[in-house]
Amino acid sequence: MNEAKLKDGERVNQLFSTDVKIIQNSEVFSYSVDSVLLSRFPKLPQRGLIVDLCAGNGAVGLFASTRTKAKILAVEIQERLADMAERSIELNDLTQQMQVIQDDLKNLGRYITGSKVDMILCNPPYFKVDKKSNLNESQHYLLARHEISTNLEEICKIAQRILKSNGRLAMVHRPERFLDILDTMQAHNLAPKRIQFVYPKLGK
């Protein structure tokens, strides 16, 4: 474990039930239980390449690193979050396994050509932008939660393009988008093989 390089407002947290530590900032971004659920849901490939789309501060990839030896490529559009992810990777001495790309998903073809990805992990923005949208959040949370810089259509299109023929996409999303997810996946020749609904508490 290396020494943490912290900036104003940042703290180091230990990831749930692991020895991995992560740099967080409540005003910018902090991981939620969705990241834990996503990283534990799929059977991860033990070799090859895993790509974490909409990576935020790197929580999903860091969680996944405890369960696989595969290379993990975390892609995040926001410079501040990508920087936090990079420093968390250094903090945990994972630079040989994990790498961060700070760029728009629209430019992913610059970094990954062809169908060579074994698994995609994705905790995407959940909410469509419409007249009812609450757009008064901080810019960091706004981009993380709302389909402004990317959307479900683009994520499925990317998955169709970069996954190997036997590759898999694991995604966490809101139940009210379920039918939309199925339709969008089908439009891009993706078929759900396993679905798990998660309830916040018994009886909900």
Predicted regions and their residues:
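SAM/dcSAM-binding transferase cores
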Residues: G203-K204
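Conserved Class I SAM-dependent methyltransferase catalytic core
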Residues: S149-P200
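Conserved SAM/SAH cofactor-binding pocket of Class I
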Residues: F41-C122, K128-S133
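Class I SAM-dependent transferase core
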Residues: E3-P45
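Mobile active-site "lid"/loop adjacent to the S-adenosyl-L-methionine
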Residues: P124-E154
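Short, structurally constrained coil/turn elements
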Residues: F16, L44, L94, Q186-N189
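General small-molecule cofactor/ligand-binding pocket signal
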Residues: I23, Q99-I101, K193-Q196
